[in-house]
Amino acid sequence: MTENRQLGALLAACHWIGEKGWCPATGGNMSLRLDLAHCLITESGKDKGSLAAEDFLLVETANNHVPSGRTPSAETGLHTLLYRLYPEIQAVLHTHSVNATVLSRVERSNALVLQGYEMQKSLSGQRSHLDAVVIPIFDNDQDIPALAQRVAAYADNRPLQYGFLVRGHGLYCWGNSVVEARRHLEGLEFLFQCELQRRLFDVNSNVDVKPNVDVNPNVEAK
């Protein structure tokens, strides 16, 4: 019964993500842990805004084997890696939003640091806007096992929290339930949009923009 509720919650999250436009043209992939040895993940080539329960495939997390023989998402290995690394993770959401894709290319370092935003508290455990939230950025790679190795190497030195970006590709985020994963996704997307807008304003800060209306409060309307 719990599994059915979680899958129902994941389907609802996928439809919501589709409405947001965060997984266009069948992009992205979503998964749900069943137990320590198995997860469900979206089948390759499925539109995330119209997924049904039968579009999720059973996968063995130890080796990415799919008993049904159907084709799971090409990035299944990143989902199963996260489930192996962190037993508390129950759901993983991978999206291709404009904000995540562009910001991951604009940021030249290997991490995006978010600080000063009240909405950082949408992420579990965050208590203050003064703290720094570090979202690692990994260079994109069509060799998913190689990319997974780089993610695992990072995690050996510093625990992954909330999510990571793949440059020019998108966001992976997760939670200890579908509800938490969805909240983390929404919070991070808001923060990404804020950070992207802030950087755009910084670039244009030397431009003298004058209002095209009279804003003098002492002038009476005629």
From Swiss-Prot:
Annotated residues for binding of Zn(2+): 94, 96
MF terms in GO: methylthioribulose 1-phosphate dehydratase activity; zinc ion binding
GO biological process entries: L-methionine salvage from methylthioadenosine; monosaccharide metabolic process
Obligatory cofactor(s): Zn(2+)
Pathway: Amino-acid biosynthesis; L-methionine biosynthesis via salvage pathway; L-methionine from S-methyl-5-thio-alpha-D-ribose 1-phosphate: step 2/6
Record's keyword annotation contains Amino-acid biosynthesis: yes
Cofactor note: Binds 1 zinc ion per subunit.
Keyword line: Amino-acid biosynthesis, Lyase, Metal-binding, Methionine biosynthesis, Zinc
GO cellular component: cytoplasm
One Pfam short name: Aldolase_II
InterPro entries named in the record: Aldolase_II/adducin_N (IPR001303), Aldolase_II/adducin_N_sf (IPR036409), MethylthioRu-1-P_deHdtase_MtnB (IPR017714)
Gene3D superfamilies xref list: Class II aldolase/adducin N-terminal domain
Entry keyword DNA-binding: no
UniProt EC number: 4.2.1.109
Catalytic activity: 5-(methylsulfanyl)-D-ribulose 1-phosphate = 5-methylsulfanyl-2,3-dioxopentyl phosphate + H2O
Coiled coil: none
HAMAP family: Salvage_MtnB
PANTHER family in alphabetical order: METHYLTHIORIBULOSE-1-PHOSPHATE DEHYDRATASE (PTHR10640:SF7)
Family according to the record: Belongs to the aldolase class II family. MtnB subfamily.
Function summary: Catalyzes the dehydration of methylthioribulose-1-phosphate (MTRu-1-P) into 2,3-diketo-5-methylthiopentyl-1-phosphate (DK-MTP-1-P).
Protein name stated in the entry: Methylthioribulose-1-phosphate dehydratase
Origin species: Yersinia pestis (strain Pestoides F)
GN (gene name): mtnB
